[in-house]
């Protein structure tokens, strides 16, 4: 048992942060390529002026035993994928020493999870403005949600997707907007496993695996999964190769012919 005051000993926290940093693959610094569009519209507003949307792709049929593509769901505009994602992570806030330590531990765990997705093939640019990001990671508990029994339930993490129409200098495209909430109050491994799972959703894995050894398992196993499994990576590779209208230029609805 650690001696009294051990958890408040600065050397312990320095060691913990250093260990997380060593385990964390590099993630790019804030990128000037992440800029907010001039305007974001709801898809309902876009529907009045845009050419009709092609039917969404059907869910994938079961592939080999090496992935779980058939458990993913596409959006009305296709599979949710981008060649590069702008990600904003809530920075460490000003506060007392204990709060600052908790925030740093949270940030280190999120950075580690983010780095593992980068190593698995996700291209990430760091945004220093949340409005410039497609993925925003917040240090807070997710909003309560009704469970199957109708009762409100709390959770440690959640990712929520919304599709919008983005416009800049006459160009328009469908842009995913993902809010990710990761609660504090977990150990470093619990934080990292939660962040890994929710970021997997954010990067397009909108579905769950039936294997507790996968980061995207519907029901976690006894040991936290701290990096994507080979099945997670295989499913991600399949997703990234699928066609999608998300991020591609949109055609405007043709103007009516004169006199009609």
Language-model features: locations:
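Bacterial N-terminal signal peptides
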Residues: 13-23
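Metalloprotease/metallohydrolase-associated module, dominated by Zn2+-dependent proteases
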Residues: 29-33, 37-42, 156-190, 206-260
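Metzincin-family zinc-dependent endopeptidase catalytic domain
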Residues: 104-198, 206-209
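Divalent metal-coordination and catalytic microenvironments
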Residues: 117, 197-200, 216, 236
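Disordered inhibitory propeptide/activation segment of secreted metzincin zinc metalloprotease zymogens
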Residues: 2, 21-101, 168-170, 259
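Short, solvent-exposed loop/turn elements at domain surfaces
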Residues: 94-102, 145-148, 224-226
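N-terminal secretory signal peptides that target proteins for export/translocation
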Residues: 1-7
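Tryptophan (W) side chains
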Residues: 7-9, 13
């Amino acid at each position: 048992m650690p001696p009294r005051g051990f958890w408040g000993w600065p050397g312990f926290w320095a060691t913990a942060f250093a260990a997380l940093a060593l385990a964390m693959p590099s993630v790019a610094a804030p990128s000037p390529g992440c800029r907010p569009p001039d305007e974001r519209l709801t898809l309902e507003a876009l529907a009045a002026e845009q050419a009709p949307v092609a039917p969404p792709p059907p869910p994938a049929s079961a592939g080999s035993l090496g992935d779980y593509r058939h458990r993913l769901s596409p959006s009305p505009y296709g599979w949710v994928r981008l060649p590069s994602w702008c990600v904003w992570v809530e920075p460490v806030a000003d506060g007392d020493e204990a709060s600052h330590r908790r925030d740093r531990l949270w940030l280190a765990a999120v950075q580690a999870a983010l780095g593992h997705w980068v190593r698995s093939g996700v291209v990430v640019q760091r945004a220093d403005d949340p409005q410039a990001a497609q993925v925003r990671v917040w240090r807070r508990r997710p909003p309560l949600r009704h469970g199957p029994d109708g009762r409100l339930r709390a959770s440690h993490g959640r990712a929520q997707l919304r599709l919008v129409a983005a416009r800049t200098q006459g160009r328009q495209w469908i842009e995913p907007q993902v809010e990710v909430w990761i609660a504090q109050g977990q150990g470093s491994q619990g934080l990292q496993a939660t962040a890994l799972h929710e970021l997997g959703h954010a990067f397009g894995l909108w579905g769950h695996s039936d294997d507790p050894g996968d980061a995207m398992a519907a029901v976690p196993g006894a040991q936290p999964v701290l990096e994507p499994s080979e099945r997670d990576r295989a499913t991600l590779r399949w997703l990234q190769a699928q066609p999608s209208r998300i991020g591609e230029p949109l055609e405007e609805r043709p103007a009516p012919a004169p006199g009609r």
